[in-house]
């Protein structure tokens, strides 16, 4: 069953990340153990914009991947089979950055869990701004 998680407090009860590394503002849809759709609202107040890049702020690609992974982690951690686990990056395949993400953008991430076997898993994700693809990748993860 699909549900939304609109309260940041509820997201913080699911994910272990905290400022400045909590990169999910809202979950629009989650099907535990299958998929999640979440939002990152990008503002000029993000700490990474101080150095990336002064005078031309662009959200770092690695943080787009991290935000995507956090949305995927919601799909994992809302499945009672994985409650209390810690999903961690094990690899990234096929990462592509299609357009820069700028202050004022709202990135909508969609992540589908492809498989989980034992403590390892694979997911496919994408991020869009105004319906345009900005990032996509396959994420390999380990559950600790």
From Swiss-Prot:
List of catalytic residues: 52
SUPFAM superfamilies in alphabetical order: Thioesterase/thiol ester dehydrase-isomerase
Cellular component annotations (GO), alphabetically ordered: cytoplasm; membrane
Keyword Cytoplasm: yes
Cell compartments where the protein resides: Cytoplasm
One example of a Gene Ontology biological process annotation: lipid A biosynthetic process
Any one GO molecular-function label of the UniProt entry: (3R)-hydroxyacyl-[acyl-carrier-protein] dehydratase activity
Transmembrane segments: none
Pfam families linked: FabA
Catalytic activity: a (3R)-hydroxyacyl-[ACP] = a (2E)-enoyl-[ACP] + H2O
Enzyme class: lyase
Protein name from the UniProt record: 3-hydroxyacyl-[acyl-carrier-protein] dehydratase FabZ
Gene: fabZ
């Amino acid at each position: 069953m699909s549900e939304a998680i609109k309260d940041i407090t509820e997201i913080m009860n699911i994910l272990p990340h905290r400022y400045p590394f909590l990169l999910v503002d809202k979950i629009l849809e989650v099907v535990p153990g299958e998929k999640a759709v979440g939002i990152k609202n990008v503002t000029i107040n993000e700490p990474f914009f101080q150095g990336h890049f002064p005078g031309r702020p662009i959200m770092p690609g690695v943080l787009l991947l991290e935000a995507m992974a956090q949305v995927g982690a919601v799909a994992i951690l809302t499945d009672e089979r994985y409650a209390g686990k810690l999903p961690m990056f094990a690899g990234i395949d096929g990462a592509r950055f299609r357009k820069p993400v700028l202050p004022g953008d709202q990135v909508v991430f969609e992540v589908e869990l492809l498989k989980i076997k034992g403590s390892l898993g694979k997911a496919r994700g994408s991020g869009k701004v105004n319906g345009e693809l900005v990032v996509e990748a396959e994420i390999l993860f380990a559950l600790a």
